[in-house]
From Swiss-Prot:
Organism expressing this protein natively: Bos taurus (Bovine)
Function, as annotated: Small GTPase-like component of the intraflagellar transport (IFT) complex B.
GO cellular component, one term: cilium
InterPro entries: P-loop_NTPase
Subunit structure comment from the entry: Component of the IFT complex B, at least composed of IFT20, IFT22, IFT25, IFT27, IFT46, IFT52, TRAF3IP1/IFT54, IFT57, IFT74, IFT80, IFT81, and IFT88. Interacts with IFT88. Interacts with CFAP61.
Residue sites binding GTP per the record: 10-17, 63-67, 123-126
Domain of life assignment: Eukaryota
Family: Belongs to the small GTPase superfamily. Rab family.
GO BP terms, alphabetized: intracellular protein transport
Gene name of the record: IFT22
Alphabetical list of Gene3D superfamilies matching this protein: P-loop containing nucleotide triphosphate hydrolases
Name of the protein in its database record: Intraflagellar transport protein 22 homolog
Lineage, uppermost ranks: Eukaryota, Metazoa, Chordata, Craniata, Vertebrata
GO molecular function, one term: GTP binding
Entry-linked Pfam families: Roc (PF08477)
Length: 185
C-alpha cells in the first residue's frame, strides 16, 4: 500500500484545520482554536488508488500551525513530505504576501515540483465567495489555484482535492518504480 505525506500550511486563521477536517471527513470544529505545532490526520480515500494497480493508498495530512513561533519546527515537519497545500484566507490582503514565504520554505527549499503544490483560496462562511483570482506574485501564479467555500460549494473543493491526491500518488508510485528499477539494473 502506498503512503503519502501532505502538509497543510499557511498563515494563521486561514482555515487550514476546517478544510483538513472536511477533506478527511474528521470531526467538525465550530470555534476557532489555533493549531499548536501540528495535527496529523490519517485517512484513506476510496477514490484514489495507485497507478492502474488498484491498490489502496494511505495519507497523512499534517495540519501545521500558522504561527511563526513554530518556524523552528518546520524542517521536521517537511521531512519526507510528498506534497504541500498552501491555504490562505482570500479576504485578508496580507495573506497574499505571507504565502510567498510559505511557498519559499515548504516548496522551493524542499525542491518540490509545482505539481506537488496546491494553493487554496479559502472563503469563510458569510464572507461571500469572490471567485476572482487574486493577484499572485510569480512563481505563485504558476500554481494550481482552487477556491473553497464550504458553505456554498463544498463538493467542488472535495473533487479538486481528490484530483490533487491522485497526482501525488502517481508521483509517489513513479518514484518508487524508478527506485525499484535502479535496484534491479
Amino acid at each position: 500500500m502506498l503512503k503519502a505525506k501532505i502538509l497543510f500550511v499557511g498563515p494563521c486563521e486561514s482555515g487550514k484545520t476546517v478544510l483538513a477536517n472536511f477533506l478527511t471527513e474528521s470531526s467538525d470544529i465550530t470555534e476557532y482554536n489555533p493549531t499548536q505545532g501540528v495535527r496529523i490526520l490519517e485517512f484513506e480515500n476510496p477514490h484514489v488508488t495507485s497507478n492502474n494497480k488498484g491498490t489502496g493508498c494511505e495519507f497523512e495530512l499534517w495540519d501545521c500551525g500558522g504561527d511563526p513561533k513554530f518556524e523552528s519546527c518546520w524542517p521536521a515537519l517537511m521531512k519526507d513530505s510528498h506534497g504541500v497545500v498552501i491555504v490562505f484566507n482570500a479576504d485578508i490582503p496580507s495573506h497574499l504576501k505571507e504565502i510567498e514565504t510559505w511557498y519559499s520554505c515548504f516548496v522551493q527549499q524542499q525542491f518540490l515540483q509545482n505539481t506537488q503544490c496546491l494553493l487554496i483560496a479559502h472563503h469563510k462562511p458569510g464572507s461571500g465567495s469572490d471567485k476572482d483570482n487574486p493577484a499572485l506574485a510569480p512563481p505563485l501564479n504558476k500554481l494550481k489555484l482552487v477556491h473553497s467555500n464550504l458553505e456554498d460549494d463544498p463538493e467542488e473543493i472535495r473533487m479538486e482535492f481528490i484530483k490533487y491526491l491522485r497526482s501525488i500518488i502517481n508521483s509517489v508510485s513513479e518514484s518508487r518504480d524508478r527506485e525499484e528499477m535502479s535496484i534491479i539494473t
